[in-house]
Amino acid sequence: LTQGVDGVIVAGASGVGSELCERAAEKGVPLVFASRASYLDEADTLRPDNMQAAQMLTEHLIRRGHQRIAWLGGKSSSLTRAERVGGYCATLIKYGLPFHSEWVVECESSQKKAAEAIGALLRSNPTISAVICYNDVIAMGAWFGLIRAGRQSGEGGVETFFGHQVALGAFADVGENALDDLPIVWATTPAREMGYTLADRIMQRIDNTDVQSGHQIVAARLVTVK
């Protein structure tokens, strides 16, 4: 804001969004926020639809026959995680499936921690047939954890699961071509596409100062890797 720029795209800025908006307004500089969750009510924002992504992923697994679906990863302080877990829970309820709080496991974004966590989860609850992972790092760790536990991941229906396979689902912010070649179903909101949308939006704000602030929500897409 002190460099004479015509507009600013802000990534994140959780907790300081209001302050940045005030400073930008004083200088007449338009701001657009790239947010991971919905915490800036008064600002011009672009964010992924975390709840829709989780609903889509959970529903896909349910339609494949899974009824005992767990959650792995993220911290309870994360608003992104809260929105995703909300979508997961809402979908279980929609289909009349049980929600078990002990099946929602916090975990650092570490492959090692995720591998350990999924192993412990399945030892305590061996009938779980699918696990939704908070991000790609957690998913990779979970995949290694399944191998260590003598299990496999697979996208097939539950009728093919004879106590050895566990389906994995996960969230990603990269395009289909950049996803790991693992048997995981992904809910992806590509960061590159969001970047193009952000660039278009800031140019609109620069060219027309009367454009009102608004919220744009980008829906996720389902990608299966077999």
Predicted segment positions?
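Conserved H-loop
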Residues: 67, 98-100, 152
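Alpha-helical recognition/docking segments in bacterial nutrient-uptake
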Residues: 1-59, 63, 123, 127
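Hinge/beta->alpha junction and helix N-cap segments in small-molecule ligand-binding domains
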Residues: 14, 45-56, 72-119, 132-141, ...
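Short beta-strand segments enriched in small/hydrophobic residues
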Residues: 7, 60, 68-75
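Flexible loop/turn connectors
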Residues: 122-226
